[in-house]
């Protein structure tokens, strides 16, 4: 490793030691929210050698802020994980215990890259205003098709007046049962999202040009579930609550249905080939998928 790469590799976690759980920052604590949106979080207790997360009803969309266990990274990086997602019983895809109509589930887990909020003030969430979210994620679980495995990518930008909330653009695609490997590369303003399903080759899932993202980002793991109920809540109240029912409707119970397990989270510095330095990596006409995969996912 060259020195900078060795430094970033030290942030990685193979989830072999329960004590390393304390190395990961939690967004709800750092931004002074009163509610932990995880019902369960452990390394090794649920499954040896894996980090397990079971979320309460929650979401990342527009100004809904969900779970993020993260570290802070300056400059370019490649973040990689291997993840499995199930319903809470571990017997099938997320959302399959109770089912639901299309677009009601959105129970997924993956890698999230986020701009730190510059407006955070100690020591309660009264600082918060809508419209300030900037993030990208790549996740695996059940999205628009309840009870089926899918891949979701999302790019959220801050509001531009007269907009009153952050704006999210998402894409959903099919996937097979896990484990699935997810990889997010940040190279200058570009975010390259890669996926490898079990027994298959790496593929480029999505490319983004995000010059609005700062040089230092929050990078980590996220989980979210039960959009049908989470989406009934106002943004601030969602972000500050452990949700057990629909907004102002206690008779309509929440139905969170996700168990996510991560094998590792690894960080390296990307080594961009000289001919591609300065190229528009978000443009397939300028840089092909094969060229990206050659340096972001080399080998078998």
Please provide the spans of the model-predicted regions.
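Extracellular glycan-recognition regions
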Residues: 1-300
């Amino acid at each position: 490793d060259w020195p900078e790469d060795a430094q970033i590799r030290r942030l990685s976690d193979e989830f072999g030691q329960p004590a390393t759980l304390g190395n990961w920052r939690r967004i709800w604590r750092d931004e002074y929210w009163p509610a932990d949106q995880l019902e369960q979080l452990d390394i090794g207790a649920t499954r040896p050698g894996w980090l397990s997360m079971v979320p309460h009803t929650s979401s990342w969309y527009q100004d809904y802020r969900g779970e993020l266990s993260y570290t802070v990274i300056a400059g370019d990086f490649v973040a990689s994980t291997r993840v499995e997602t199930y319903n809470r019983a571990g017997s099938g895809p997320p959302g399959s215990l109770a089912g639901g109509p299309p677009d009601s589930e959105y129970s997924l887990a993956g890698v999230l890259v986020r701009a730190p909020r510059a407006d955070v003030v100690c020591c309660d969430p009264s600082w918060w205003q809508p419209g300030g979210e900037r993030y990208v994620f790549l996740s695996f679980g059940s999205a628009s098709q309840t009870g089926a495995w899918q891949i979701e990518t999302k790019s959220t930008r801050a509001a531009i007046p007269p907009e009153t909330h952050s704006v999210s653009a998402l894409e959903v695609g099919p996937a097979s049962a896990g484990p699935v490997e997810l990889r997010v590369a940040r190279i200058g303003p570009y975010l390259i999202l890669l996926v490898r399903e079990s027994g298959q080759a790496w593929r480029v899932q999505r490319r983004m040009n995000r010059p609005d993202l700062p040089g230092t980002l929050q990078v980590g793991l996220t989980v979210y579930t039960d959009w049908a109920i989470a989406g009934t809540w106002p943004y601030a109240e969602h972000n500050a609550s452990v949700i057990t029912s629909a907004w102002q409707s206690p008779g309509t119970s929440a139905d969170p249905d996700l168990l996510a397990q991560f094998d590792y989270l690894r960080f390296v510095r990307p080594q961009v080939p000289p001919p591609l330095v300065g190229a528009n990596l978000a443009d397939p006409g300028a840089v092909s998928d094969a060229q990206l995969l050659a340096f972001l996912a080399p080998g078998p």
